[in-house]
Amino acid sequence: MELSDYRAQIDRIDAELLQLFAERMQTAAGIAAYKKEHALPVLDTGREREKLAGIVKAAPEDLQEEAVSLFRLLFSLSRGYQRSLLGSSSTLPEILKRAVVTTPQLFPTSAAVACQGVEGAYSQQACDKLFQHPSVFFCATFDKVFAAIEQGLCQYGILPLENSTAGSVNAVYDLMQKHNFSIVRSVRLRVDHSLLALPGTKLSDIREIVSHGQALEQCSEFLKQLPNVTVTRCENTAAAARMVAESGRKDLAAIASNACAEIYGLQSLQDRVQNEHGNYTRFICIAAKPEVYPGADRTSLLVTLANEPGSLYQVLARIYGYGINLTKLESRPIPGSDDTFRFYFDLEASVYSPELPKLLGELESICEHVCYLGSYSETV
């Protein structure tokens, strides 16, 4: 046989599969009507387990795993179709729709905004990039930024989420599991670190360098060149600069921005000490409730899955099936649980596309819990 003959045979089989798939889904519709009439749940785990056992016995030995994967997908598609016919309650599409309708057309130019750190912090610089006239409320920790939003002390909060050099800010991802909030915007900020000290200080004088842990990671190659210098972590780069200014010590330096040098009267001993010159940090802007502004093309979700084989695959298969681009996937352990994780998803899709609400509705039906974190656009 020629390749064209094999392809013709595949085409014939695919046509038969498609016809059988449509017939199967029509039968599933009849099952949905029966279950509705008799108040039966859509999911019947016993029936699915029995079916899979029969499939394993009937399938060729070298195709058993593939057959199980295929039928698990068919079962999942069937359940989703039945739920759509039954009009099963799905809250996430409604939350999205309501937020789109009720949010003003323009993102505010001024607001009370919570930022972690002190004057000169990178969070403040990200805030200034988003708002023309912000009233900044400084918080000592990331946790207090979340709290300021929940308690109504500020309209918005700015938090770092990931850095192009040092990776994810895990402390923020962990706090996402504990607080109620909605992401309304994100912004990418170029981060250039400098080594700051009191005026008149020389690099050879430095015996201790202080900064935030993420900044220290971003400048690890530079720090390797100073093996006799003690490295100390603190809560914020701007706080490190202020510490140097208030210490009066000529042997102490901070890794922070040049903006901090101007604010705290310091001098730069060396500019751009980060590993990568194209060093960016992505910040999110959070609010107490969903606000979806025109142009929103990114959606974030926090998902809890059953601790069983294929649970993550089912989510990824649906994202792929709707043609939605997955731009971020982060897993974080659930506090108090040894073997269960929550997954953070960033999806690239317009809020006006019909696929996004359909996906949200399906995810609600197959996941243990789905938290909608917001739909927004990113400022670069």
Model-identified regions with their sequence ranges:
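Domain-level signature for soluble enzymes in the chorismate/prephenate branch of the shikimate pathway
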Residues: 1-380
